[in-house]
Structures are given as structure tokens and as C-alpha cells.
Amino acid sequence: MNQIRTIGIIMDGNRRWTEKRGLSRLAGHRHGAKKLRELLGWARGAGVETVIVYAFSTENWRRTKTEVSFLFKLFRRFLTVEIDSLVADKTIFRCIGDRYSLPEDLQSAIAKAEARTKNLGPRTLVIAVSYGGRAEIVAAAKVFARRYQDQLNAAGEKEFSQGLATAGLPDPDLILRTGGEQRLSNFLPWQSVYSELVFTPTHWPALTRKEFINILEEVRNRDRRFGK
């Protein structure tokens, strides 16, 4: 039986969930943030140590200013309200993505949360904000070229991965996407090469603990060969 210690989650379907209920898009994101809090508890109970969530992609900047501002407001609130819970649960918080494109007050809140939790563990929560997988690989390639310019032939994948935003973290055992779409949408392209993939039609706010646990059980029973 496979161990599932690290999962990546593409939290999709907030807006479609609200449309079916006659609610505003912003209400969908609010419910989505609540679902993340619930899922962290489910994951902890199931023995998952690292959760990486795709909260805001580089492409999401194309959304309306109102929606983007509201998403950042939710993120600030999450950091403010949940930081004590993360500390109590001995959870390290990390943020990956182009944080310097974010509002300065949000950058500050991220830095404070990271500093407060950096010496905790064994659990880790990683939130990808203003993140794009291709941009991450390009940035890692630049780091790699600087570090190993005189010894390129002696360096390989392990050395390259040290320049990724997720350096020091295990690759995901599972990537789960809610909302029905069946693609990774630029989420962890380097790290997901041997991840098990699950696409559920359930919209993110509607995900239940029962479905989440069933997904983990199904993946635990898959035959993972890692190319062998």
C-alpha cells in the first residue's frame, strides 16, 4: 500500500458552485477558503504531512480587479485567523510564486507567517500565489546556471531541483483537482512527473471528507511503478 505524505490540490470550481446556487462569485471564494481550513484537518487525520494548494495562478491576474482584490483579502484574513492554528498544529507555512507582484501588505503578512512557523513541523502548508510552473522552472534554470556554470556536466536533476520554489519538500504523491477539468494548468510541472492524478467533478466548496478519504484510499492501492 502506498504512503501518501504529500498532496497538491488545484482548488477549482468555486465560481461554478456559486452559479448553481445563485450566489456571487465572491461568495464562492469565501466558501472555498472555509473548505481549505476543513481539508487541512482531514489531511492531518489521514497522515498527510505536506499540503500544497494552488490558490492564485499567474493567469488569474486577468480576472476583474474586484475579484482579485477580494481573493487577496481572503488570503490576508486566512493568514491572520489561521496562523495560531498552524502554530498549534506544528505546521510550517510557506508561500511560493512571484510574491513581489502582490500588494506590499500581503507580502508582509506572508513573511510574518513564514517567520513565525519556520521552526515548526512535521507538517507543512504551501500556498501557491501568483504562481506559474513554467516561470518557476525558468527561475530555477537561472539559479542552476549561476551555481554550476563551471561544472554543468557534474550536476543533474537533484541539483536543478534545489533552485525550485519547493526546494526541500518532497514531490507530491498525489495531485487532486476538483471542479471537473482534467489538466494541471501549469501547477508543479517539474514536481508532478510521478504524482498520481485524480480529477473529480465535485466543485471545491462541495468536497466532503468522505470523498477525500476515499480518494486517498484509492490512490494508496494503485500500482506506483515510478517508471520501473
Mark where each language-model region is.
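Flexible, compositionally biased loop and terminal segments
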Residues: 1-228
